[in-house]
Design a protein with these regions (language model features):
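Transmembrane alpha-helices
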Residues: 136, 140, 173-205, 229-233, ...
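C-terminal transmembrane helix and the adjacent membrane-cytosol boundary/short C-terminal tail
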Residues: 98, 155, 186, 190, ...
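Generic hydrophobic transmembrane alpha-helix motif, especially the helices
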Residues: 109-145, 152-153
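Transmembrane-helix boundary motif in ABC transporter permease subunits
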Residues: 78-108
Length: 269
């Protein structure tokens, strides 16, 4: 009896965890529908949900949505690969080498405090308004969280573990592979997760620079023709893609940190 009750309670808890994240979005959707139907929200300011669904379906059937999503996704992932790769490499360098930290960290921290929007005029002068400018902005945005969390992760590895490994003859690459990297990995993946979200934020900024394709182009073009429903579709697309990126990051954490107590079965991710 106790076992049955425990199993039922666990199943109910899992069901609640699956439902709970959707309660706030559903409440907002209901409030949105009520607001537009009662006239509290003007359809010129925010169209009713049904109009947004119709606009989305029209974009899907015409193929326009998928074409623009593919372009934006390619830009985002390529920018993430470049910026994240450089951030990881420099984070490892400054974390492992005091000389590299002295030479690079101060400069990187100064650049980090420059707002991305302030860089746009300079980026246009450097790269023009083609794809290079967009990729640079995305790469710049994702670079810093990956760099900072990699650097912090390396520096926060327990020194006693390193000394213990050395006492057993573990040195060089083996020390890095079996002690330093596993110890730093949780922090590195936090940076990756944050960077995956920031990737889409930077892409929104980047695609306002005279884009000829992509979700940003679709949204800006709709704004010119006062197609508010299409603008909302574009915003929701960014939100969905950002959520998918976060789900991917969580999955990556569970797979690569399956040995960590916080990510084992039954632990809160």
């Amino acid at each position: 009896m106790t076992t049955t009750t425990s199993t039922t309670g666990a199943a109910a808890a899992r069901a609640w965890r699956g439902i709970a994240p959707w309660l706030v979005p559903l409440a907002l959707l209901v409030a949105w529908e009520i607001g537009t139907r009662t006239g509290w929200l003007s359809t010129r300011v925010l169209p009713e949900p049904v109009a947004v669904v119709r606009a989305a379906w029209s974009l899907v059937t015409s193929g326009e949505m998928w074409a623009n999503v593919k372009v934006s996704t390619w830009r985002a992932l390529l920018g993430f690969a470049v910026g994240g790769g450089v951030g990881l490499a420099l984070g490892l360098a400054t974390g492992l080498s005091k000389a590299a930290e002295v030479a690079l960290d101060s400069t990187i921290q100064m650049i980090r405090n420059i707002p991305a929007l302030a860089m746009i005029p300079l980026v246009i002068l450097w790269f023009g308004i083609d794809e290079k400018a967009k990729l640079f902005l995305v790469a710049l945005g994702v670079f810093f969280p990956v760099y900072i969390n990699t650097y912090h992760g390396i520096r926060s590895v327990d020194a006693s573990l390193i000394e213990m490994a050395k006492s057993y003859g573990v040195r060089g690459f083996a020390l890095y592979r079996h002690v330093i990297l596993p110890g730093a990995l949780p922090s590195i993946l936090v940076g990756v997760r944050f960077a995956l979200g920031l990737m889409w934020v930077m892409l929104i900024v980047a695609e306002t620079i005279s884009a000829q394709s992509g979700i940003g182009y679709m949204t800006m073009n709709a704004r010119e023709f006062l197609q508010t429903d299409v603008v909302v579709v574009g915003i929701l697309l960014y939100a969905v893609l950002g959520k998918l990126a976060d789900v991917l990051a969580k999955w990556l954490e569970r797979v690569t940190l399956c040995w960590h107590p916080a990510y084992q079965s039954g632990a809160k991710a």
